[in-house]
Design a protein with these regions (language model features):
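P-loop NTP-binding core
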Residues: 1-211
Length: 211
């Protein structure tokens, strides 16, 4: 939300209101001039969604049902998940057709990946049989770091073609962009980070990482 240049004080309805069934997804959408995306924004209310969802019937399907109403409006819907495996993440996995997993090439990230893959398998078995892992994206990569290279090699060895060829480097301009409320493409399109994300977009659209 912040990265899209949206002022949180101007949000009337957020994705939280959608998840608890108070408004439709369409009622929350704001157009981001900074990123050219339509965004269903989030604010501090989302922190309470986990508790509020507990008492809702078929709570795992709230986001899926909301997105379903807008299927004919958008070609792509991107769901930005929290870094924790909770009910919000489960809602995202139930709603999604594919999962893109961004991952730092560090030991603890590798350990967490195992937990996430296990969760995706359980969701696929019990709640969303069509979900697939679209790909793994190596991010904040520092080629000078020996451990990063080792983890990268291990990912490629274990997941093969599921690992994107594109690698997102550790880049100062990428780190600066969110504080300016801009996507990397609009903050500094010539930066190594922005060019890497453009290459990733092309790879995803062409599906070349699975070749």
């Amino acid at each position: 939300t912040s990265g899209g240049g949206i002022n949180k004080s101007q949000i009337q309805h957020s994705i939280y209101d959608v998840l608890i069934g108070e408004v439709s997804l369409d009622e929350t959408i704001l157009h981001s001039k900074e990123s050219l995306f339509d965004i269903s924004p989030a604010n501090q209310d989302l922190a309470g969604a986990e508790i509020d969802l507990v008492g809702i019937e078929r709570r795992e399907y709230m986001l899926k049902n909301a997105i379903g109403a807008l299927k004919k409006t958008y070609d792509f819907v991107l769901i930005d998940c929290p870094p924790t495996l909770n009910l919000l993440t489960v809602n995202a996995l139930v709603a999604a057709t594919a999962v893109l997993i961004p991952m730092q090439c560090e030991y603890y990230a590798l350990e967490g990946l195992s937990d996430l893959v296990g969760t995706i398998k359980r969701v696929k078995k019990q709640l969303n049989p069509t979900i697939e892992i679209e790909g793994l994206l190596r991010t904040l990569f520092d080629k000078r770091n020996t451990l990063a290279q080792q983890v990268s090699d291990e990912l490629s060895s274990h997941f093969g073609s599921k690992v994107y060829k594109t690698i997102i480097p550790r880049n100062v301009r990428l780190a600066e962009a969110p504080s300016h409320g801009k996507a990397a493409m609009f903050y500094d399109r010539s930066s190594k980070g922005a060019k890497a994300y453009l290459a990733l977009a092309e790879e995803i659209l062409k599906g070349t990482h699975n070749e």
